[in-house]
């Protein structure tokens, strides 16, 4: 019989904010079902004698204490002994990240892994959105400077994003063409995403939560004054909201495709009823904040859909 263990591959717990962190929220919920929580960092994942092993620690979560987690025991765990593995480390989606998906591929027929490591690897979050480009503002993916220049000339205000970035890091708003900046940006990132700027971002974006191919909630994130970044990590204010008919139709279409691609948990982002190209499948976040705003516990939904 499989042990009641949930292994979480994530960033070091001491760097997480329990007030907003989704991984901790999910861990706390499954802990209430008497599962043990084993936490490890990606760098501590190995293949030893043909076995997938992680060095980490068993922890308990307690939201009522200043230090929200307690280390019970440090251990090397053969991960097939767990019932679920959650891939929860933040991007960048680099070779180190990709390597962990190949390692976890070796045991995914024996342990339920969320999200499926093969699917994470094959779905580049921003490039995947190009399947639904008719629902997006004008967008190109390129590293050709002349293409970027022509795109800027047509659209006047343009957002530049690294394809494999996260949390609003290294995003630029171009109001005039800056050749040197773009050359440096392309040299650093290779292919980049260029998108027509949507001024209504000042009213906030929307993050839709997708679990097992279904829509389960939405929040709006409003950039702080003087910013165009709606990420919570960049100081955005989060409020309750609802989806429009158009947003719901697009979200259901994407959710259906995500389920077909074996993506269990995802976040879809909109600005002004347009898909902004961020479909988060690596480490979707926001459900703790959604719970604080609405009282609806999507961590319970998550585990219920997994039949934990």
Describe these PLM feature segments.
Residues 34, 46, 175, 210-215, ...:
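Short acidic-glycine loop/turn motifs at beta-strand connectors
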């Amino acid at each position: 019989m499989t042990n009641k263990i949930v292994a979480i591959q994530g960033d070091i717990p001491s760097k997480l904010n329990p007030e907003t962190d989704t991984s901790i929220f999910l861990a706390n919920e499954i802990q209430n079902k008497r599962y043990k929580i084993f936490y490890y960092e990606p760098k501590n994942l190995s293949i030893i004698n043909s076995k997938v092993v992680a060095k980490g620690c068993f922890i308990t979560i307690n939201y009522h204490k200043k230090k929200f987690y307690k280390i019970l025991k440090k251990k090397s765990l053969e991960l097939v002994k767990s019932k679920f593995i959650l891939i929860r480390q933040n991007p960048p989606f680099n070779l180190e990240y990709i390597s962990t998906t190949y390692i976890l591929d070796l045991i995914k027929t024996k342990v339920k892994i969320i999200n499926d490591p093969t699917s994470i690897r094959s779905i580049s979050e921003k490039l995947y959105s190009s399947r639904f480009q008719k629902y997006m503002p004008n967008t190109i993916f390129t590293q050709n400077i002349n293409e970027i220049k022509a795109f800027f000339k047509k659209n006047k205000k343009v957002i530049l994003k690294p394809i494999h970035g996260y949390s609003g890091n290294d995003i630029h708003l171009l109001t005039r063409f800056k050749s040197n900046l773009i050359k440096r940006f392309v040299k650093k990132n290779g292919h980049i995403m260029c998108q027509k700027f949507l001024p209504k971002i000042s009213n906030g974006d929307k993050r839709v939560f997708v679990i097992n191919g279904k829509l389960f909630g939405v929040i709006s994130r409003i950039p702080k004054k003087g910013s165009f970044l709606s990420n919570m990590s960049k100081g955005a204010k989060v409020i309750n909201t609802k989806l429009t008919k158009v947003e719901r139709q697009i979200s259901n279409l994407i959710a259906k495709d995500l389920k077909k691609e074996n993506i269990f948990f995802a976040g879809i982002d909109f600005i002004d009823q347009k898909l902004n190209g961020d479909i988060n499948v690596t480490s979707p976040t926001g459900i703790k904040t959604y719970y604080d705003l609405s009282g609806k516990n999507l961590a319970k939904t998550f585990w219920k859909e997994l039949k934990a």
